[in-house]
Amino acid sequence: MDFTLDKYRELLTALKLHRDFKLRHDVDLRPDFSLRIAHIEAEMDLQATYYFRVVPESYDKEIIQQIVSMGHTAGYHYECLTTCNGNMEAAYEDFLHNLDKLRKVTPINTACAHGSPKSRWNSQDIWNHYDIHALGIDYEPMLDTDFYTTLYLTDTGRRWDGYRVSVRDKVPNHQERWEQEGLTFHTTDDIIHALSNIDHPIHHYSLLIYTHPQRWMPFGMGWLKEASLQSLKNIAKRIIVCTKY
């Protein structure tokens, strides 16, 4: 059974065979689910970065502090161009305001954009006009990662090959090359099996692992609901991708 807490533990165990990896989490919803994942990682002596949106369904001061207290770090999951309807100046001010709000809770030196698949705007485009690093942000994954040496794996769409239907959560200039090298995975078990094979090309790369903690839960009604919802969302995103491109 995929996307359960037990399966996540199995993934972490397999990742330890690789050694060169970073764990990143987009806290789009349900920060309490992120807290649960943070506990699992801490129990396994692993540290991760949790990117929080500054919206009621993600931002929770107490949970952020609890996660950081375990040795994890927090980042800002920004969506300023979407919330400001494409107004670049307003988006920049919105970014500054929310960054300041988060920094009153915990140090923040990393940020990544929320995908917002239904939005006309890609919030990452703000950095075509402003300098994110001048704001004390040392690392923006899509701007500061060398994807020639780092493999990006994300569970977007509740699958590990969700880039096929994703609007923005992908690395366009590298995805085809990774496919040619056999570095595409559909299930978590696919990744675990690759990590368990020392000769697999996955071991030629550093790994950047991105998950959405609200997708990982014990099997039950919540799991079934999430699986069904993501299937419908993937159909909608595929339509958007086909329409746009």
List the model feature ranges, each with a label.
Residues 53, 79:
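Histidine-centered beta-alpha loop that forms part of the nucleotide-sugar donor binding/catalytic region
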Residues 1-24, 28-49, 58-59, 68-70, ...:
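Terminal accessory/targeting
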